[in-house]
Regions:
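Protein-protein interaction interfaces in oligomeric scaffolds
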Residues: 170-189
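Short, hydrophobic/amphipathic alpha-helical patches that form generic packing surfaces
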Residues: 149-164
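Short, flexible active-site-proximal loops enriched in glycine and acidic residues
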Residues: 166-168
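Conserved short "hinge" loops at termini or chain/domain junctions
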Residues: 1-68, 73-148, 162, 189-215
């Protein structure tokens, strides 16, 4: 789950393999994906699992293992631990036995981002279930154009801009200050504009604006 490609970032930044290797560009993309993800997710902690509707009954009856989060409408389960992957590590489920006042974590076997559902390794009974998770209003698996563009511009801009005279490090990548900083600043400004529009779209505001291709 990384929302940019090495060729597109190279094209936007105007850098060659002599400037950055593919591995180094990929590190910019990985960092940019985490950063954009942090702007579009909403976190829910210890949400009690219970009946939602006839399809999402969330029965705790000793036979059911599939459950849905309450905040599912128009949402997708998201990357909550910022490893650029959406998997079972992004959800935590605990069961509470009121009779003994004991609590234990339940193993999650699989998750479905689009359905906002998850499958447990066991069918719980006689307990309460609670879940920690994150959701986003933008499909993180097949990202829309704004999500892709935001990440591309952020990765490209970051590859060109230093920070107050000091080297900036992202993983194994070291950015030297002042390297074509004018264009880098332009790219980051465009990223901020695209991110603002993306957040407006997510919050149900204006229709999609024009994509930026001029820089």
């Amino acid at each position: 789950m990384e929302w940019a490609s090495v060729p597109e970032v190279r094209k936007k930044a105007g850098v060659s393999e002599e400037d950055y290797t593919d591995v180094e560009i990929q590190e910019f993309i990985s960092w940019a994906t985490k950063e954009v993800n942090s702007k579009i997710i909403t976190r829910y902690i210890r949400e009690r699992i219970g009946f939602i509707d006839s399809y999402r009954s969330n029965k705790i009856d000793g036979s059911n293992t599939t459950y849905f989060v309450r905040n599912w409408l128009g949402k997708y389960l998201a990357d909550s631990n910022f490893d650029n992957s959406i998997d079972v590590s992004d959800i935590k489920v605990v069961k509470l036995d009121r009779s003994t006042s004991t609590e234990s974590e339940v193993v999650v076997s699989s998750i479905n981002s689009k359905a906002c559902s998850f499958v447990l390794s066991e069918a719980p009974s006689n307990c309460e279930l609670y879940v920690d998770y994150c959701v986003t209003s933008v499909d993180p698996i097949t990202p829309d154009s704004f999500l892709w563009q935001c990440t591309t511009y952020l990765a490209a801009g970051t590859s060109l801009v230093g920070n107050d005279g000091f080297d900036v490090k992202f993983g194994n990548v070291s950015i030297k200050p002042g390297k074509d900083g004018g264009k880098g600043k332009q790219l980051l400004t465009e990223y901020e504009r695209l991110l603002d529009q993306l957040l407006v779209n997510i919050n149900g505001g204006t229709a999609y604006g024009d994509m930026a291709e001029k820089i």
